[in-house]
Every structure is written in C-alpha cells, then in structure tokens.
C-alpha cells in the first residue's frame, strides 16, 4: 500500500469523492432524480422518481449485440415517455453531475439513483431502436448519443456498482449502433460522430 501511495495512488474514500458543483450546473438536480435524495422512501415523490422510467420489457426485446442478437421491431409506449426523454436530454446539457450521496457512510452509502438511471438508459435505447426501424437514422443517432451521455453521468462516482451500471447503460445503447451498422443504415458522417463519441469514453480513468 505504501508503495502505491508513494506513486500517487489514493486508498481513502475522501480522496475520490467528487467535488461539489453549482446546483444550476448539476444534472443530478434534474426533476427526475432530485426527489431520490430526500431520503424519504415512503414519500410519493420518492416512489414516483424511483419508478418513473420502469417498464416491463417483453422477451421479444431481449438482445445482445455481443452475441449478434438483433431486436425484433420495437413496439412500446413511446408517446408516453417521449416528453420525459426530451426533458432528460435537455437536463444533460448541464456540464456536471454529482448526486447527493452520503459519502460519509462509506461503502454503505445508499445509491437510489442507479436503477432509475439504468431504466432511463433502456428507454433511450428502445426509442432509438424504434426510430431506426422506421428509417429515422438522425433520431436514432440522437437517442443513442443521449443514452451514452446518460451512462457517462456516472463516470466520477467512486463505487464499483456505479461503474457497473454505467457500463450496463453504455452496452444497452451500443445495441442500436450495432444494429444500424450491420444493416448499413448509418452515413459516413454519422459513423464519424459515433467514433468520436466512443473514443471519448475511458472506463479506466472514470
């Protein structure tokens, strides 16, 4: 441990806590997530935020781009969630993200946002798949990028589970890219956009 500390590595949780950020610049203050950190699991606001993006995914929507498994044509409640996804995309224009986690609780800290984040990531992926199936590659591109950006909101969190959820959200949204690629639907310009986005992701650095 001393050897690695001499090289600059940190082993205490205080050294990896993300710095405070201005509220108006903080994605975590989005109306979709802020109620989760009132830490009142019995309140209607907490429950609504927790379940906001929860959908039951039918077996026909199971897929895995790593195994070469495509999705069937997507039919879901797009109209119901479209306005929420639009607002969420707008919230992601804020330059920072720091959830009000009780870091003083160490590795026992409650992370109520992770399930909601993953569910929202799934919705961006489903929306992009629906757009792609209709030939709307521009819309599919934007939804996919939004899903990836959502996952990257977790990049500074020092918890292993946060990084696993981050990776899961990225994987979910890589699916539409892969499907469009094997179907030769993306333009050269769109592929360049994807390449630049993928190159900006550093899972080891956080």
Regions found by a protein language model. Give the residues of each.
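Aromatic-rich surface patch/π-platform used for binding flat ligands and interfaces
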Residues: 1-206
């Amino acid at each position: 441990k001393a050897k690695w500390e001499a090289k600059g590595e940190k082993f205490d949780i205080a050294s990896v806590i993300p710095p405070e950020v201005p509220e108006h610049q903080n994605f975590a203050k989005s109306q979709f997530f802020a109620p989760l950190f009132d830490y009142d699991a019995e309140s209607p606001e907490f429950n609504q935020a927790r379940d906001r993006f929860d959908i039951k995914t039918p077996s026909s929507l199971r897929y895995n781009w790593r195994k070469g498994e495509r999705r069937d044509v997507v039919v879901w409640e797009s109209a119901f969630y479209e306005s929420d996804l639009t607002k969420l995309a707008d919230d992601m224009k804020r330059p920072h993200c720091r959830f009000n986690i009780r870091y003083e609780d160490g590795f026992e800290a409650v992370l109520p946002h992770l399930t909601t984040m993953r569910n929202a990531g799934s919705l961006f992926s489903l929306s992009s798949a629906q757009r792609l199936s209709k030939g709307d590659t521009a819309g599919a591109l934007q939804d996919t990028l939004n899903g990836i950006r959502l996952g990257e909101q977790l990049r500074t969190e020092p918890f292993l589970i946060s990084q696993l959820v981050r990776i899961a959200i990225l994987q979910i949204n890589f699916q539409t890219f892969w499907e469009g690629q094997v179907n030769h639907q993306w333009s050269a310009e769109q592929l360049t956009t994807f390449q630049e986005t993928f190159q900006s992701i550093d899972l080891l650095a956080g």
